[in-house]
A protein has these predicted regions:
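Short, flexible, mixed-charge glycine/proline-rich loop motifs
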Residues: 64-74, 87-93
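Short cysteine-rich clusters marking metal-coordination/redox-active sites
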Residues: 77-80, 99-102
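Short metal-binding segments enriched for Cys and/or His
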Residues: 103-122, 126-135
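Long, low-complexity, charged/polar intrinsically disordered regions in eukaryotic proteins
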Residues: 159-231
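Positively charged, polyanion-binding regions of nucleic-acid-associated proteins
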Residues: 227-247
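Short acidic, hydrophobic short linear motifs in intrinsically disordered regions
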Residues: 246-263
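Short, positively charged loop/turn segments that connect secondary-structure elements
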Residues: 258-274
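Charged low-complexity interaction tracts in eukaryotic proteins
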Residues: 272-300
Length: 300
């Protein structure tokens, strides 16, 4: 009817959407389709909520609340089989949501532009401290469009892909700034290996929760690694992905020696360290050793 939330967003009547609504109603009446819809995690990609929209005047406040409300209503836990996440009642300095089953914590970052090579984050010192302690929340990156207030892309980065290698220290704020001398940081998304950016929604196409959780599980071998080791492993994973080859040689990874030396300036034995990480990735079934210095990236 005209007062339904759907029509409050799109207007009434709206022939553009009426066909889709009729089709959906028809599909739901089909027992097979209905059973399928029950068994998979169904998402509504529309962010719009009239009550939230009217409650706030600035668009920045509106989109922050709309994205948080959408996330809590629609998102599941990628780390376990829990189908809902809950928001912290009192805003924590870092995390926004948590899983009531496995207690994983998540931070949500939302923006209307596609995420580029880097994103702004908080205080540099706090970020480094959090990485060393291992209590950094997992990151969700939500990309939306204001054309129809809907989600276009959503990805999650497990916290064990966070290392000093992906943190860029920013210049201190000017003496005239309100927080003079404060030092922030950027997250260098371009330095995170592909396996560390798990796609949940891609170009408005929703990935099945089973696929998302499988991809999460495939990299969970990093979970119990300490910060310095984790940084080295993920940096080597990035080098492997950068080669963009299913099979590669040890010498090809050695070609990243200078790149790795810049990321780990205190380590003077780069080649032995490379071999150590490759051995670890072999042990974790991420790589297969073919012999004679050749490796194969296993299907993920």
């Amino acid at each position: 009817g005209p007062s339904s939330p759907y029509n409050l967003l799109y207007g009434w009547p709206n022939p553009l959407f009426s066909g889709k609504t009729t089709l959906l109603n028809t599909l739901v009446r089909n027992p097979f389709i209905f059973d399928l819809l029950i068994r998979v995690h169904i998402m509504d990609l529309h962010l719009f909520n009239e009550s939230i929209f009217r409650r706030y005047k600035s668009n920045s406040q509106r989109i922050r609340r709309l994205s948080e409300d959408w996330f809590e209503e629609q998102m599941y836990c990628p780390a376990c089989k829990c189908d809902n996440l809950e928001s912290f009642q009192n805003n924590t300095p870092v995390a926004d949501f948590y899983c009531p089953k496995c207690m994983s914590q998540f931070q949500l970052k939302s923006q209307s532009n596609p995420f580029g090579n880097r994103i702004l984050d908080g205080a540099y010192s706090k970020m480094i401290e959090s990485i060393h302690k291992g209590d950094q929340p997992h990151f969700f990156l939500l990309h939306y469009t204001l054309n129809d207030w809907s989600v276009l892309n959503l990805e999650v980065i497990p916290n064990y892909f966070f290392s000093e290698s992906i943190i860029e220290k920013r210049k201190p704020l000017a003496p005239t700034a309100r927080r003079a001398g404060w030092v922030g940081c950027n997250l260098l998304l371009s330095r995170i290996p592909e396996d560390g950016r798990i796609q949940t929604i891609t170009d408005s196409i929703i990935h099945e929760s089973k696929e998302v959780r499988t991809n999460w599980l495939k990299v969970s071998f990093l979970k119990n690694q300490k910060s310095p080791s984790r940084g080295w492993i993920t940096d080597i994973m990035w080098c492997i992905k950068d080669l963009d080859k299913k099979e590669f040689t040890l010498d090809e990874i050695y070609s990243y020696k200078n790149h790795l030396a810049k990321l780990h300036p205190l380590n003077k034995n780069i080649k032995p360290k490379i071999r150590q990480q490759l051995q670890f990735l072999r042990d974790k079934k991420y790589l297969k050793f073919l012999g004679s210095g050749e490796y194969q990236l296993k299907k993920r």
